[in-house]
Amino acid sequence: MGNRTEEDYNFVFKVVLIGESGVGKTNLLSRFTRNEFSHDSRTTIGVEFSTRTVMLGTAAIKAQIWDTAGLERYRAITSAYYRGAVGALLVFDLTKHQTYAVVERWLKELYDHAEATIVVMLVGNKSDLHQAREVPTEEARMFAENNGLLFLETSALDSTNVELAFETVLKEIFTKVSKQRQNSTRTNAIALGSAQAGQEPGAGQKRACCISL
């Protein structure tokens, strides 16, 4: 997956980062978009987003990654935060089981606010802290499989799987979008074919136009 200038792109995909405060969402964002890591552990206040344009085949995708704090007092922003999102990384801290124990609640909140077709990846962050692990890989992987989620373990500190996590989500979104466009094109072709087969041309052409919008 290659880089491209921010002004030159074919699609914009909004991806949200969700999960408890302190799991490393902000550092995943900064590692992916700016290749930076901050050891300052202050909690993110409010909402921020960063962008990075990447190539998927011949298509330029502008990934708009949104980040917010996981504290209860900021939950009032959820509707606007999730609006328009086509992808989500649900992040927990591998070294703190309590952050994993609430991923189901975060998943419910996501589905309450976002489209049902949103692509979701469960991300176990801080994989570099091997000795402090509290969440077994297979336990998290099984939860992801049972809930139809993608799954990866990452380390924003040493960059392990950060690129792969975002790339996998973006590819899955792009695949869905491509299929929708193909289905729309196929539907238009059928409508136009019906018009040519004997329907009133004006009506058939109008129907195809409406379907494609």
Swiss-Prot record:
Subcellular localization(s) per the UniProt record: Cell membrane; Cell projection, Pseudopodium membrane; Cytoplasmic vesicle
An example Gene Ontology biological process: exocytosis
InterPro entries with a match to the protein in the record: P-loop_NTPase, Rab_GTPases_membrane_traffic, Small_GTP-bd, Small_GTPase
Class in the EC hierarchy, top level: hydrolase
Membrane topology: Lipid-anchor
CDD domains xref list: Rab11_like (cd01868)
Residue sites binding GTP per the record: 21, 24-27, 38-39, 43-44, 70, 125-126, 128, 156-157
Propeptide residues, chain positions: 211-213
Free-text activity regulation comment from the record: Regulated by guanine nucleotide exchange factors (GEFs) which promote the exchange of bound GDP for free GTP. Regulated by GTPase activating proteins (GAPs) which increase the GTP hydrolysis activity. Inhibited by GDP dissociation inhibitors (GDIs) which prevent Rab-GDP dissociation.
Coiled-coil residue spans: none
EC assignment: 3.6.5.2
Residue numbers covered by motif Switch 2: 67-84
Positions of Mg(2+) binding: T26, T44, D67
Reactions that this protein is recorded to catalyse: GTP + H2O = GDP + phosphate + H(+)
Known cofactor(s): Mg(2+)
Sites bearing Cysteine methyl ester, chain numbering: C210
Protein family according to the UniProt entry: Belongs to the small GTPase superfamily. Rab family.
Function: The small GTPases Rab are key regulators of intracellular membrane trafficking, from the formation of transport vesicles to their fusion with membranes. Rabs cycle between an inactive GDP-bound form and an active GTP-bound form that is able to recruit to membranes different set of downstream effectors directly responsible for vesicle formation, movement, tethering and fusion. RAB25 regulates epithelial cell differentiation, proliferation and survival, thereby playing key roles in tumorigenesis.
Quaternary structure, from the entry: Interacts (GTP-bound form) with RAB11FIP1, RAB11FIP2, RAB11FIP3 and RAB11FIP4. Interacts (via the hypervariable C-terminal region) with ITGB1 (via the cytoplasmic region); the interaction is GTP-dependent. Interacts with ITGAV. Associates with the integrin alpha-V/beta-1 heterodimer. Interacts with VPS33B.
Name the record gives this protein: Ras-related protein Rab-25
The gene coding this protein: RAB25
